[in-house]
From Swiss-Prot:
It comes from Alternaria alternata (Alternaria rot fungus). This is Allergen Alt a 2. Keywords: Allergen.
Amino acid sequence: MHSSNNFFKDNIFRSLSKEDPDYSRNIEGQVIRLHWDWAQLLMLSAKRMKVAFKLDIEKDQRVWDRCTADDLKGRNGFKRCLQFTLYRPRDLLSLLNEAFFSAFRENRETIINTDLEYAAKSISMARLEDLWKEYQKIFPSIQVITSAFRSIEPELTVYTCLKKIEASFELIEENGDPKITSEIQLLKAS
């Protein structure tokens, strides 16, 4: 008997487990999850910081504490940092890189919460702008419609989403860009 295993990105795996009522029967046993816990991510980031800042400190937590300040120190401080990353190594390294650039611009050698928040917003905006650029030609109204969802709760009802999109349609029609307006007319018809 042949059994297959699947690799899923973590966000896809979480969506399936939340939305599929037969998830445990159909998917759970066939998936190998690559999971990073906070200790592994601390070790990864500490190794990178040791090299980058030429630190000769043995323990990973001490490396973290040497490179952070205020409420970011300690295990809980590191875990606070991880809240911005979905526990993905690439996200953590990008966040820390941007946070250290922020600290260095302020003539600080350690990062603080403000640096992390700035880095998270900066990375998020860069990803959103990349999305806009990638899809602008085939979906001209993408920027207006996605902007309607800025600064709101991450989970919405279908009704709330539709109301946000309808409000975007009205805004687009008021501005009168013919290309975008014709696209909206097509979307409304379906």
